[in-house]
C-alpha cells in the first residue's frame, strides 16, 4: 500500500448555522462530486446568501426555460455541479474538468445523476458562428453563466441551481472519514499529486485507500484498457464507498470537523432555506438510491491538429433528455425553438450501446487543441466506438 500523507489541519470557528449547512450538504454534494473524477474538490463553506460562497447567475434565480422560479421543497429541480481546473491556470478561469447534472424530485424522494463527458462536442451558448468545440471550454469562455446555458441547450432541460468547486480538498475529506475501501480491478500505478517523482501502486483485490491514494485511483486512465469507462467504474466505487462512510454513525458525529476540511473555494446559488429543504427531503439517502444515467457515443478527431472530441449518439442522447425531462416534469417549448436548436450534436452521429443506466463521467482524453472546429463532415474525421454494453 502506498505511503500515507500527513494532511494539514485547518481549524476554523463556525457558527451553529453554518455547521447545520455543512451537515446538509456534505452527504449530498460531497459524494456526488467525488465520483466525477475531478481529481478532488472543495465542499461548500456555506449556502447563505450573505456568505461569499453565494453567487447568483446573471439571469437571476429563474432559468430562462422556466416560467417561474422553481420551489425546491415542492417541485422537481436540477443542479449542475462544475469541477473547475483552476489549479492549471493559477487561479484564472480554467475549464470545467467535470460536469454533473443532478435532478431531484422532492415529492418522491428520487435522484438522477448524469455526468457529461468533458470533451463532448457542442455549440457553446455564447457562440454566434455556428462552430462547435468541447463543452468544457464554456467555463473559460463565459464562466458559470455560459456553462449553465450551454448545458441547458445540450440536454434541453432547465438548470435551476449550480455549484462550482475546485480540485483541492478531496484528500482531506477522505482522510477525515478514515479512508475508503475499494476493489481494485487490476494492478496499476499512478503518480502522486504531491510529488510527481512518487508512484502509488495498486494491487488487484481489496484495498483501503487514504486521500492521496484515492485521488490517484480516481484519476488514472492510460493504464486501463477500457479507458474512460474503466476509470468511470473506479470513480463510482469511490462514490459508493464515500457515501457509505459518510453515513456511518462515527462520521456523522464529527461532520463539522469533516466540513472544515472542505470548506473553501466553492460558489453556488443555493440559499440557506433551500439547503435546509434538501436536508429534510434527502436525510438518510444512500448511494443505492441514485439512478445514474450515461451518454454513449464515439470518438471523433477533427482539424489539422487531429483534435479529439466525444460525439454523443443521437438516439441515446434523446433518451437521456426525455428521462431527465420526465423526472423534472418539464416539457420543452418547441414552438419557440428554445430547446434543441443548438443542442451541440449532429443528427447523423452514431455509436454502439444506447443504454441509459450506469455511470459515465468525464471523457478525459485531452486533444492537442481546444479551438473551435465547425466541421461536421465525417470525411474530415476518424471515429472509434467508445461505448460499452455495460453502460
From Swiss-Prot:
Map out region (Disordered) in residue numbers.
Answer: 329-391
Q: Locate the transmembrane regions by residue number.
A: 24-44
For this UniProt record, the keywords arranged alphabetically read as follows: Cell membrane, Cell wall biogenesis/degradation, Membrane, Signal-anchor, Transferase, Transmembrane, Transmembrane helix
- Signal peptide extent: none
In alphabetical order, the GO MF annotations are: transferase activity
Q: What sort of enzyme, by top EC class, is this?
A: transferase
- GO CC annotations, alphabetized: plasma membrane
| Mode of membrane association | Single-pass type II membrane protein
Q: What family is reported?
A: Belongs to the LytR/CpsA/Psr (LCP) family.
Instruction: Briefly state the protein's biological role.
Output: May catalyze the final step in cell wall teichoic acid biosynthesis, the transfer of the anionic cell wall polymers (APs) from their lipid-linked precursor to the cell wall peptidoglycan (PG).
The name on file for this protein is: Polyisoprenyl-teichoic acid--peptidoglycan teichoic acid transferase TagV
* Gene responsible for this protein: tagV
Amino acid at each position: 500500500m502506498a505511503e500515507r500523507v500527513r494532511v494539514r489541519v485547518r481549524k476554523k470557528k463556525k457558527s451553529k448555522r453554518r455547521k447545520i449547512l455543512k451537515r446538509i450538504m456534505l452527504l449530498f454534494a460531497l459524494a456526488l462530486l467525488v465520483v466525477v473524477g475531478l481529481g478532488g474538490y472543495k465542499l461548500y463553506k456555506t449556502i447563505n446568501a450573505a456568505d461569499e460562497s453565494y453567487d447568483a447567475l446573471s439571469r437571476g434565480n429563474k432559468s430562462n426555460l422556466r416560467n417561474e422560479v422553481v420551489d425546491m421543497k415542492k417541485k422537481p429541480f436540477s443542479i449542475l455541479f462544475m469541477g473547475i481546473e483552476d489549479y492549471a491556470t493559477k487561479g484564472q478561469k480554467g475549464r470545467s474538468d467535470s460536469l454533473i447534472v443532478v435532478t431531484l424530485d422532492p415529492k418522491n424522494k428520487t435522484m438522477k445523476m448524469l455526468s457529461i463527458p468533458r470533451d463532448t462536442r457542442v455549440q457553446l451558448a455564447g457562440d454566434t458562428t455556428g462552430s462547435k468545440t468541447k463543452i468544457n471550454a464554456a467555463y473559460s469562455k463565459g464562466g458559470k453563466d455560459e456553462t449553465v446555458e450551454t448545458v441547458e441547450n445540450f440536454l434541453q432541460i432547465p438548470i435551476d441551481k449550480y455549484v462550482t468547486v475546485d480540485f483541492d480538498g478531496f484528500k482531506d475529506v477522505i482522510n477525515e472519514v478514515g479512508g475508503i475501501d475499494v476493489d481494485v480491478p487490476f494492478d496499476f500505478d499512478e503518480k502522486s499529486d504531491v510529488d510527481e517523482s512518487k508512484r502509488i501502486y495498486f494491487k488487484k483485490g481489496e484495498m483501503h485507500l487514504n486521500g492521496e491514494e484515492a485521488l490517484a485511483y480516481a484519476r488514472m486512465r492510460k493504464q486501463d484498457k477500457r479507458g474512460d469507462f474503466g476509470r468511470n467504474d473506479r470513480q463510482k466505487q469511490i462514490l459508493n464507498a464515500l457515501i457509505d462512510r459518510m453515513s456511518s454513525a462515527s462520521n456523522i458525529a464529527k461532520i463539522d470537523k469533516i466540513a472544515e476540511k472542505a470548506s473553501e473555494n466553492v460558489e453556488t446559488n443555493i440559499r440557506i432555506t433551500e439547503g435546509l429543504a434538501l436536508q429534510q427531503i434527502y436525510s438518510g439517502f444512500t448511494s443505492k438510491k441514485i439512478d445514474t444515467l450515461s451518454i454513449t457515443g464515439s470518438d471523433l478527431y477533427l482539424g489539422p491538429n487531429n483534435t479529439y472530441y466525444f460525439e454523443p449518439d443521437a438516439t441515446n442522447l434523446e433518451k437521456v433528455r426525455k428521462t431527465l425531462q420526465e423526472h423534472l416534469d418539464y416539457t420543452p417549448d418547441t414552438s419557440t425553438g428554445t430547446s434543441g436548436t443548438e443542442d451541440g450534436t449532429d443528427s447523423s452521429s452514431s455509436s454502439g450501446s444506447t443504454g441509459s443506466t450506469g455511470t459515465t463521467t468525464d471523457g478525459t482524453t485531452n486533444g492537442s487543441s481546444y479551438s473551435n472546429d465547425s466541421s461536421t463532415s465525417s470525411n474530415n474525421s476518424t471515429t472509434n466506438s467508445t461505448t460499452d454494453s455495460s453502460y
